[in-house]
A protein has these predicted regions:
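Long, charged, low-complexity intrinsically disordered regions
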Residues: 1-82
Length: 82
């Protein structure tokens, strides 16, 4: 995970997280990165739910999952062909 590009959303609100995640994914696609990490923290899960909703609705995302060793982080895999 340390080598993956990451977006840290600590301290962000749900509405700003949505915009930041969309911009981050666009950047990763432009850079031809196929895997990245979104750090949302554990807390009450509000930001995590927003992140997962954005990822679920983005057709360019192959899969996403909570990191096994760090539940405050979601690993995102981007489709090869977009």
């Amino acid at each position: 995970m340390n080598n993956l590009p990451s977006l840290d959303l600590h301290g962000e609100y749900s509405f700003s997280s949505e915009v930041l995640v969309k911009e981050f994914i666009n950047d990763q696609i432009s850079l031809h990165n196929k895997k990245c990490c979104i750090i949302h923290g554990i807390g009450e899960g509000i930001v995590r739910k927003t992140v997962h909703e954005v990822l679920k609705n983005d057709k360019r995302i192959k899969t996403y999952y909570i990191d096994f060793f760090n539940p405050g982080c979601t690993i995102v895999e981007i489709k090869e062909k977009i």
